Amino acid sequence: MNVQRPGLAVGPLFENPESESSEPGSPAAAARWVEASTEAEASAASSSQGQIVAAPTAEERPWEGRPQEAVSRTRAWREAGDVDEPLDLSFLSLTPLSIPLVSGLRRLNVNNNQLGDLPDTLPGTLLELEASENRLTRLPDLPAGLQRLNVENNRLTNLPEPLPAALEWLGAGYNQLTRLPEMIPPELIWLGARNNQLTSVPESLLTQLGQWSSIDLENNPLPHGVQTNLVTAMHAAGYAGPQIFLPMGPVELARRPLHEVVADWLEGDLETVAAWRGFANEQGARDYAHFLDRLRTTVNYGNDAFRQAVAIGLRQAVARPQLRAQYFEQASGASDSCEDRITLTWNGMQTALLIADVEDGVYDGSLHQLLQHGRVMFRLEALDGIARETVNSLRRTDPDADIDEIEVYLAYQTQLRDTLELRHVAPDMRFLNVSHVTEEDVARAASSVRELEARGFGEYVATRWQPWERVMRRIAPASHAAMQEQLIEAMGEEFRSRLDEKLAEHGLTGDADAERVFGAEILNDIARRIKGETMEKVLRGRGLEL
């Protein structure tokens, strides 16, 4: 038995085709469409109570799926009055998109329907269009201001040309694309085209986009020659184009002798290059050579100051075996991962060089510079803690999200390099756009580090930054010796007295676990006081204070 559901009375909405307010995209038309649809809902309810009639034919109903839910969502969106909120018509099994799209609409989500096409005319105000998981075989002309387009998992064989000049994100994976547009929007940060039928790419692909952009071409039938040409171009010195993910996967650079790789960074410095030839058999030398080769392919290679910093590090490591050993150790395994891991590892090597300079007495005669380097170390430690919490928070929020902690850590370092005067780290990174670190995150981190520094930098230098104690032993041996004597003396009677008092205060006398916990707290407090007083005395004697 079939119960009739009257078709929605959409016809009268467009009785006067000459009227501007009757255009499918106009607010008036959309309003009357919603009104008519609402009347149809009421009519359907009354009809079902009083009569049983034949079901409508396919011609009598303008769409399949759940049109009434689409009506309700559209009405709710209009009533909310916030044009920045997306109109969400996803998961409704709609076949055509018959709802008139109101002018002024900025964000539209029609994911997971059964759409075979989209309206020929989309609102000119549209900024974001989500239309994945449908049956689209073509796309209409796209609004010039469109910034984000997601049409993954459809049946597209090509993309419209030209693409909007403002487009920043394009997801077109899992379609049947046989070619990419010749002209790529210059602002595009992400082009996802994996799992298509691409056999070639535009010749100018690598020159149309900059180093911040990424293109995913995995799982396409690209000939080996095409892929090899792309890889060769991306690994050329000075390459400043996009990062491209290819079907062949990561490409292993041929391993070169250490001195040959070093020579690329030290042009004309034959003496230093010859010295590096003698380190080829040291443990970790081969990994370090490969690391230096990969470092030439990073986004920072085009920066003159960066290249000079690498060269300085190489010259310093010639005469400092311990520093060289740290370089070799840190390079182990670093080249097996993405480009940004290479950059983050180099940042660590720069930190090792800075600490080596301090410990070797380079700043013994310039305590002001020494303390500034101490602030840099404090800020880096604070940023590490913030990055770690960001990673944990992102994973708690979405356990299935692909969070790469390397990108998170490096994002904070590069984005706060100037603000926090972290001048020794690399200035750029490749994949900032997938780090999940927002401008708001960066601003909060800067404020947090400044607050932590204001409260805790003095204690950090006095008790936790080992280079300071080594410097003090050299420049103020008497003060350092007196400090050691004070510490030894305080760890006797003062420590025992304070511990007994605290145990009694908490009713835990004789409790071994409490002794360990309270004992550690008291020892730290004693060290803070004595080391802090000594540090302040040494600095005051040289006209400095924190």
Curated annotation (Swiss-Prot):
GO terms under biological process: protein ubiquitination
Annotated NEL domain residues: 257-546
Comp. bias intervals (Low complexity): 22-48
LRR-type repeats, residues: 104-125, 126-144, 145-166, 167-186, 187-208
Record's compositionally biased regions (Basic and acidic residues): 58-67
GO molecular function, one term: ubiquitin-protein transferase activity
Post-translational modification: Ubiquitinated in the presence of host E1 ubiquitin-activating enzyme, E2 ubiquitin-conjugating enzyme and ubiquitin.
Residue segments, region Interaction with target proteins: 1-248
Domain notes from UniProt: The LRR (leucine-rich repeat) domain forms a slightly curved solenoid and may mediate interaction with target proteins.
Protein name, UniProt field: Probable E3 ubiquitin-protein ligase NGR_a03640
